[in-house]
């Protein structure tokens, strides 16, 4: 629901047990019913925030990011449970597709464990050179990590054609 914004503000979605919910830092938006019986969204569990009980606050949020919370709430409401599930399935499916395309292009996955939409590969070429080539071709490539590794990520917005082209560029740089 929120586009990237040069490092922030941003937010994420999470699930937790009742026992743990008051231990979570940050602002949490919850669904409720207003006095007219209409569905609405509010900043919930506010007792732990700095502006209510500063001495027990578990977060350092000092500025209001309510617009982000509102945007995310509208997005989640519009998506519904099935829509959000579909987005998650697309992210996972596309990440696994890209990992296999990159494996075929010469990169080796570092971990053989279940993953959602991010994964790490070893890169036989200079990661800075690969990143420069990808940027030159209009890709915000993987994140170079220490030791010649790269963190890759997909979302529901990535197309098969984009991932195929990315793998071709990787093969061009890494296996030339």
What are these regions (language model features)?
Residues 2-105, 109-112:
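Active-site C-terminal subdomain of aminotransferase-like
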Residues 6-7, 93, 110-115, 135, ...:
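A structural signal for short secondary-structure junctions
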Residues 10-13, 99, 120, 131, ...:
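Short, well-ordered alpha-helical packing segments
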Residues 12, 91, 119, 134, ...:
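Hydrophobic, well-ordered secondary-structure elements that form the walls
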Residues 72, 76-84, 112, 116-119, ...:
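Cofactor-binding beta-sheet edge motifs in enzyme active sites
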Residues 86, 90, 98, 102-103, ...:
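Membrane-embedded transmembrane-helix bundle of lipid-linked glycan/lipid transferases
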Residues 106-137:
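Conserved PLP-binding catalytic core of the aspartate aminotransferase-like
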Residues 125, 129, 133-136, 146-176:
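PLP-dependent enzyme catalytic core of the Aspartate aminotransferase-like
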């Amino acid at each position: 629901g929120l586009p990237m914004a040069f490092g922030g503000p941003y937010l994420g979605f999470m699930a937790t047990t009742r026992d743990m919910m008051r231990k979570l830092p940050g602002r949490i938006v919850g669904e409720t019913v207003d006095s007219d019986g209409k569905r609405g969204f509010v900043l919930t569990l506010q007792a732990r925030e700095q502006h209510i009980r500063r001495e027990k606050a578990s977060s350092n949020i000092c500025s209001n990011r309510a617009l982000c919370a509102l945007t995310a709430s509208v997005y989640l409401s519009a998506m519904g449970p099935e829509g959000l599930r579909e987005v998650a399935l697309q992210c996972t499916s596309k990440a696994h597709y890209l990992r296999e395309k990159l494996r075929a292009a010469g990169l080796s996955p570092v971990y053989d464990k279940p993953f959602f939409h991010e994964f790490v590969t070893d890169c036989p070429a200079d990661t800075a050179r690969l990143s420069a080539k990808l940027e030159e071709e209009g890709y915000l490539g993987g994140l170079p990590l220490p030791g010649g590794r790269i963190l890759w990520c997909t979302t529901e917005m990535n197309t098969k054609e984009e991932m195929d082209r990315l793998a071709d560029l990787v093969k061009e740089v890494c296996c030339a």
